[in-house]
A protein has these predicted regions:
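A short alpha->loop->secondary-structure connector
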Residues: 22
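Conserved non-cysteine loop/helix-boundary elements of the Radical SAM core domain that shape
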Residues: 1-18, 26-160
Length: 160
């Protein structure tokens, strides 16, 4: 894992050098495309330090926190400390039977808890990811997902 962190930091530094060379200002940063919060917290902090140290004009900084089992208070506090203001909570579905079928390690209740923690910790924009077309998923399941979205009021919703 350490080599992965080193490679990510090197990529951040290389991109920052190119941005300086071509006078490009990065205003939006997205760390995701997976679940970066599953990395050891020291590795997460190393990546956050690299971003914060190389890009000082960030207006929107997103981290894909993914599953509730990877983003406890310590991780969320770390993200806020570095200025992350947009977070993606990715329940994928709000039906426990489908989460179990997918092998997800969280419960539906954990998503509600994580969403509430994110709000309390000051994340100004919360995105939620859902997947349409899961095995055994019904139209009623998707309807229920959207009803929950309406209750929680995330600023963004992504449906894959």
């Amino acid at each position: 894992m350490d080599q992965f962190i080193v490679s990510v930091v090197r990529d951040i530094q290389d991109i920052a050098a190119l941005c300086r060379q071509y006078d490009i200002q990065i205003r939006s940063v997205y760390i995701g495309g997976g679940t970066p919060t599953c990395l050891p917290i020291a590795g997460q902090e190393t990546i956050l330090q690299a971003v914060a140290g190389n890009f000082r004009e960030i207006e929107e900084w997103t981290v894909e926190a993914g599953r509730p089992d990877t983003a406890g208070e310590e991780v969320l506090a770390l993200l806020r400390r570095y200025g992350v203001n947009r977070i993606s909570v990715n329940p994928q579905t709000m039906q426990q039977r489908l989460l179990d079928l997918l092998g997800r390690r969280h419960r539906v209740e954990d998503v509600f808890d994580m969403f509430s923690r994110c709000r309390k910790m000051g994340f100004s924009v919360i995105n939620m990811d859902f997947i349409a077309g899961l095995p055994e998923q019904t139209q009623a399941d998707m309807q229920e997902n959207m009803e929950i979205v309406c209750q929680l009021h995330p600023e963004n919703v992504t449906i894959h």
